[in-house]
Amino acid sequence: MMRSLATAFAFGTVLPVPAGGRGPMGRGAMTALPVVGLALGALAAAVAWGGAVVFGRSSPLGGLLAVAALLLITRGLHIDGVADTADGLGCYGPPDRARAVMRDGSTGPFGVAAVVVVVMAQALAFSALAAGRPVPVGVAVAVFAGRVAAVLACRRTVPAAAGSSLGATVAGSQPATVAAAWVAVLLGMSLVAGPRPWHGPVAVLLGLGCGGVLVRHCVRRFGGISGDVLGAAIELTATVSAVALAALVRV
């Protein structure tokens, strides 16, 4: 278990993990990925809270700095998946052509637009959540939800896209019990994410639902999931969860 956790941190962050303490990315590391999400969520919440203290609760700078911190500590790994997946979905060719577009090193207009929307939506939502609560638990819950979405995307019935090395190692690797357990933990944490107990669960379920729709569409479009699809699902789920929660706390 510790080896899988170390592998998950080595994969999902820039934190130095000794080579001897980690293994290849696979089933165990994917199961442990939400733990990485908890750590990243705590970091983002702390930065957003600090930004609200320094710049004022009405300033969006705290949320923007929180997103920047996440991009730095994850090497932009998942946001790159957003760009590649958007470009692939924007291609009107057959699945093999769409997969080739995703593997291309350049970023097209769909990818650029998707990244801008995700970054700005997360930044503004994080700022709103930090302004509305003494401790922005909602920020941490949204980031955590994104990593839970990755586990759901790798459940037993989901295939890997042809030519995807990461997809081949993690697609279909997660039993339903593991996915259900992480969803239960997420829902439990989300109970304290908003002023009312139902705010958090509604927001994260909406986020997970949107992430699930994206994964299903990508399976139809690309023939399965890849590392880029997982990254896009993570970011979409986190974004929708944060935006929905920011809207609900004002109800």
From Swiss-Prot:
Disulfide bonds: none annotated. It is a multi-pass membrane protein. Keywords: Cell membrane, Cobalamin biosynthesis, Magnesium, Membrane, Transferase, Transmembrane, Transmembrane helix. It is found in: Cell membrane. It comes from the Bacteria. It catalyses: alpha-ribazole + adenosylcob(III)inamide-GDP = adenosylcob(III)alamin + GMP + H(+); alpha-ribazole 5'-phosphate + adenosylcob(III)inamide-GDP = adenosylcob(III)alamin 5'-phosphate + GMP + H(+). Its cofactor is Mg(2+). GO terms for molecular function: adenosylcobinamide-GDP ribazoletransferase activity; cobalamin 5'-phosphate synthase activity. One of its GO terms (biological process) is cobalamin biosynthetic process. Its EC number is 2.7.8.26. GO terms for cellular component: plasma membrane. It is an enzyme of class 2 (transferase). Pathway: Cofactor biosynthesis; adenosylcobalamin biosynthesis; adenosylcobalamin from cob(II)yrinate a,c-diamide: step 7/7. The chain crosses the membrane at residues 35-55, 59-79, 110-130, 134-154, 175-195, 199-219, 229-249. Joins adenosylcobinamide-GDP and alpha-ribazole to generate adenosylcobalamin (Ado-cobalamin). Also synthesizes adenosylcobalamin 5'-phosphate from adenosylcobinamide-GDP and alpha-ribazole 5'-phosphate. PANTHER family: ADENOSYLCOBINAMIDE-GDP RIBAZOLETRANSFERASE (PTHR34148:SF1). This is Adenosylcobinamide-GDP ribazoletransferase. The gene is cobS.
